């Protein structure tokens, strides 16, 4: 069994709740379009989001975790701190659930990204005992609809980039009280600072294998905290230069494989 873990933000941490739910629904459609049906999708959330998608393969795991606010920080830093702490704790709650249900693998899937319909089939048929990481993927810029940009070292850029054996993944030996932990906790931070997951697994003696095809799409849009807070916006000249040099037109085949919505 393959489990997608989707940590979904708390309603009080966003002023774009309706939009976040719409984007989540697009992610669910993508995750559930697998050619191999041996999967399930867990959405770890405070409030069950408003989605109209047929949720046969989806389960909403509600958590009662307080939102932890930093004592002193700028508004932008506060938002980053809150979302990272919230996301990391929800990931740990999801890993616990995937262990309880004896999943072979779990994948942390950000609530706005898309995945290849071939991903579950590849992982379950190859059966690497430790797991995988996505080294090749695509990025979609909302300001340049109709195009994707292929990315190397995809796992450096996007959190939807590792598939792990839940029994070999970093996880506390004893239960930690997630209601008190913040993004500074090692296990909370480990999955949020995603670029280091492959090297961390290798140091533990559980090296990951790269997926040999572009397996996910990182969506870069105005609801993405990295796109709006941590990274200055590209100039129009830079955007269109990248389009000319690196742009890949979204074909019918790509739309089918990743369940790319018409808005992209």
Predicted regions and their residues:
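Hydrophobic targeting segments
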Residues: 1-6, 30-31, 39-43
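Short, flexible/disordered intra-domain loops and linkers
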Residues: 11-22, 78-81, 178-189
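Short, acidic, metal-binding catalytic loop of nucleotide-sugar glycosyltransferases
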Residues: 21-38
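Acidic ATP/Mg2+-coordinating residue in the GHKL
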Residues: 45-47
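Active-site-proximal specificity loops/subdomain of glycosyltransferases
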Residues: 49-103
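Short beta-strand-to-loop acidic/aromatic patch adjacent to the donor-nucleotide binding site
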Residues: 102-114
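Conserved catalytic core of nucleotide-sugar-dependent glycosyltransferases
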Residues: 116-185
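C-terminal catalytic/acceptor-binding lobe
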Residues: 178-264
């Amino acid at each position: 069994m393959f489990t997608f873990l989707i940590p979904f933000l708390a309603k009080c941490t966003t002023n774009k709740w309706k939009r976040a739910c719409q984007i989540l629904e697009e992610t669910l459609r993508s995750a559930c379009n697998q050619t191999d049906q041996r999967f399930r999708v867990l959405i770890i959330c405070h409030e069950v989001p408003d989605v109209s998608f047929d949720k046969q393969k989806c389960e909403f795991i509600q958590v009662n975790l307080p939102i932890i606010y930093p004592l002193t920080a700028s508004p932008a830093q506060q938002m980053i701190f809150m979302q990272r702490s919230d996301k990391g704790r929800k990931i740990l709650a999801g890993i616990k659930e995937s262990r309880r249900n004896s999943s072979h693998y779990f994948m942390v899937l950000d609530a706005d990204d898309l995945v290849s319909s071939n991903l579950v089939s590849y992982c379950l048929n190859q059966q690497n005992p430790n797991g995988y990481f996505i080294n090749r993927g695509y990025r979609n810029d909302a300001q340049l609809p109709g195009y994707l940009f292929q990315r190397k070292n995809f796992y450096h850029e996007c959190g939807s980039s590792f598939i792990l054996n839940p029994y070999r993944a970093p996880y506390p030996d004893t239960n930690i009280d997630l209601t008190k932990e913040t993004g500074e906790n090692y296990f909370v931070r480990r999955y949020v600072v995603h670029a280091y997951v492959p090297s961390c697994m290798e140091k533990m003696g559980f090296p990951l294998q790269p997926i040999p095809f572009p397996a996910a799409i990182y969506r870069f849009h105005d609801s993405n905290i990295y796109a709006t807070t941590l990274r200055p916006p590209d100039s129009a000249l830079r955007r269109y230069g990248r389009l000319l040099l690196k742009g890949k037109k979204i074909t019918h085949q790509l739309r089918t494989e990743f369940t790319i919505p018409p808005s992209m």
